UniProtKB/Swiss-Prot annotation:
Its main location: nucleus. The gene is EAF5. It comes from Kluyveromyces lactis (strain ATCC 8585 / CBS 2359 / DSM 70799 / NBRC 1267 / NRRL Y-1140 / WM37) (Yeast). Keywords: Chromatin regulator, DNA damage, DNA repair, Nucleus, Transcription, Transcription regulation. The keyword 4Fe-4S does not apply. This is Chromatin modification-related protein EAF5. GO terms for cellular component: nucleus.
Amino acid sequence: MFKEFLLLDVLYDELLNSQTNKVSLIRLRTGFNDHKIHKFTRMEDIKINEILDMIKEMFPNQTSLNDGQITFYHLQINEIQNKIMDVYERCQRDLVGKLAKNEKELKRGKVGKVSHTGSNGNKSNSSSSSSSTSAISNGAGAAGATTHSVLSTPAASTSTTTNNSSKVDYMKSRRGKILAMYRDTVIAKLESFEQFKEVFSSFEKVNHNEVIKMENDLKKLKTLHLNNLIDLQWNLQNCVTNGIMSMGHEDTNRVLLAQDELDMTINFVRNAMDN
């Protein structure tokens, strides 16, 4: 239902901006997956087939598909607005219902906990004598079983720990390789851009600020161990920022172009890794 609401919102914007009755499936998917609400809720990205199924269900016998574009027939903008409000109200009712249900379960859980505690208190005295008697009578037989259990448990525990440890090591190694590939791809692509290369090399000539030179040494970046993607992006962002420091105001436009190239590269590699 929530996907339905989001798709209608994107569809409404696309049709309103294009002033036609056609909309690209790719633009619908991109608009949906880049939507602020979608990113905030962290739901899964939508696929083309999902979009087609939802469109057919919401607009039966009103669409046709040709060359990756959906054409809408006899569709008015206010019709989409009405559908958006209808889905919004259904979502609202659904959420209110879920909250009411959760509230009842919480109240029921508290009452059950109180009654359970009271019954345990009444039964504790009567059960203690019988349990101690049975413990004495079964002592000899239980001793052997307990000894076996105690001896076998550490072995099983050690085996489980070893397996978990090897899985964690494998995942760390795999993640490290992916991050290194990301780092190499980003730097290689950035080196092909003229503006970024000029900004990057400009502060290498600045002798009075060793900190800037060390933080932005390209050779150092190529061997940088990444904990996450933000580490690399932060270092590259420093490059553009420090480029302004070393150039002054005359080359601000060039630095802004370099910033655009950086943003484009980061998005390019992220999309490549996502797909």
